């Protein structure tokens, strides 16, 4: 079975229209979306009519959920991580699962977009 991939997808800081076309394409095509705050993320996903299974992934469950994410990717699923605003892993959850991807030789991709730095 072919492995899936993890995508770190930046989300707009403020205006929902600031999301990239590539980010929308990835969100429309992944199997699952891990979200820092599912309520906040649903605003974005509903705005763009993206209907994908969503689960919470935040600083309080990041360690355990990261293991589940890696397992699912190894089983062939493609998973996106999004935060409330900006790029996952920069002042937001994401760095733990990326470290585990490196340790486990699991493919991941960081999309360009808004960050807490900009």
Give residue spans per PLM region.
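Glycine-rich, flexible N-terminal cofactor/catalytic loop recognition
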Residues: 1-60
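Generic short alpha-helical segment signal, independent of protein family or function
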Residues: 50, 62, 74-78
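Glycine-rich loop at the start of a catalytic domain that most often binds anionic cofactors/ligands
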Residues: 46-51, 73, 94-95
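Short beta->alpha linker loops
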Residues: 36-39, 60-61, 85, 112-115
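Conserved strand-to-helix beginnings and helix N-cap segments that scaffold or border functional pockets
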Residues: 20-21, 66-67, 91-95
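Residues within well-ordered alpha-helices
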Residues: 23, 41, 68-69, 97
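Glycine-rich, highly charged phosphate/nucleotide-binding loops
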Residues: 61-70
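Short glycine-cluster motifs
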Residues: 74-118
């Amino acid at each position: 079975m072919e492995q899936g991939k993890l995508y770190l997808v930046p989300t707009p800081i403020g205006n929902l229209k600031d999301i990239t076309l590539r980010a929308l394409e990835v969100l429309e095509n992944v199997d699952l979306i891990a979200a820092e705050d599912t309520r906040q993320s649903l605003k974005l996903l509903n705005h763009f009519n993206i209907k994908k299974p969503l689960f919470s992934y935040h600083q309080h469950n990041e360690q355990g959920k990261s293991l589940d994410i890696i397992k699912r990717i190894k089983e062939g699923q493609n998973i996106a991580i999004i935060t409330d605003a900006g790029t996952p892993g920069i002042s937001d959850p994401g760095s733990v699962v990326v470290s585990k991807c490196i340790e486990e030789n699991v493919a991941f991709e960081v999309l360009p977009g808004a960050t807490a730095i900009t």
